[in-house]
Amino acid sequence: MTVFVYDKTFEGLLTAVFDAYSRRSFPDLLLAEGEPFPLFYDEAVTICTDDAKVDRVWKGLQKRLSAMALSVITVTWLSELSETDMLLFRYIRKAIDAPRTIELNFGDPDVLEVSKVWKKVTNERLRVIQFLRFQKTADGTFFAAVKPVYLSLIHI
């Protein structure tokens, strides 16, 4: 079992994709720095985020995927659900390796799951926009308490 350890950022994930292709060895598990390792593993690789590698992977994805699919990837990342990083890693790997676009291949479980997570986040975004009510505080500022299920506030 190969484990990649990275900083749990989107840029770190794209760097992990680049490093996996350059090493020709793909991880079975992605962990954040400081997370405990599984009981049995063969190799642990520490990934250092590199902007040049991130740019190369992102430009490669721009050539293979539509702007909407790239948006789906970033919104899925913003959900911050557990195992989203490994799901996106597999999705990006399939997007790079496939001869045609995988965006609408809902027979693939990873594509379907990315689509489901994207739908959950965008539906929550719409609910926040529709039902958020502001109250005026004593000092005249407006305040609204929000407790999102998915961390999609950046996307609003």
Which role does the model predict for each range below?
Residues 1-51:
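N-terminal ordered "arm"
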Residues 5-6, 146-148:
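Short glycine-centered, acidic/aromatic-flanked micro-motifs in structured strand/loop junctions
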Residues 10-11, 150-152:
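Short acidic, S/G/P-rich loop/turn micro-motifs used as interaction or catalytic elements
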Residues 44-129:
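Charged, alpha-helical interface segments at or near domain boundaries
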Residues 1-2, 129, 141:
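Short, surface-exposed beta-edge/turn micro-motifs
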Residues 23, 125-127, 137-139:
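A generic structural signal for short, non-catalytic loop/turn and secondary-structure boundary residues
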Residues 154-156:
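Conserved small/polar residues in nucleotide/adenosyl-binding loops
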